[in-house]
């Protein structure tokens, strides 16, 4: 999936994991990483590998990652 995606289109879109886990909003796209921010005051940032992208429906970017797995990619 990741090769066919126009990465510019996903900025400011919602990011979701397995079981609709909220990964926040896409903030940036780097060479092999998608950066998301979640929260209002205390923002968690997730640095997720592009290879985990499963689908994009125009509104939500879906990742093949569970809530527990996502914590490995979380930074403050």
Task: Name the predicted role of every residue range.
Residues 1-76:
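Peripheral interaction segments used for macromolecular assembly
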